[in-house]
């Protein structure tokens, strides 16, 4: 899942924290870190949101996605 998300994000998205979590075996935290870095760098595209929603129903990844989407909607107002 991490590799699929990583592949659809632009190279400008920082991956240092995400890769650190990935190397530590913390896959979900790697994905949440990658989502956070994507949000702060380029925003969350429909492709990113769709990929996460297709693969997760609950847990830290969905919690992070929902929080970032909330902040993105507030920022857009």
Predicted regions and their residues:
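C-terminal-biased regions
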Residues: 1-77
């Amino acid at each position: 899942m991490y590799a699929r998300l990583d592949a659809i994000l632009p190279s400008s998205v920082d991956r240092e924290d995400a890769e650190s979590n990935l190397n530590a075996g913390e896959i979900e935290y790697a994905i949440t870190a990658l989502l956070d870095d994507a949000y702060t760098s380029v925003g969350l595209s429909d492709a990113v949101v769709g990929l996460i929603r297709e693969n997760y129903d609950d847990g830290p990844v969905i919690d992070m996605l929902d929080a970032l989407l909330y902040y993105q909607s507030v920022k857009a107002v």
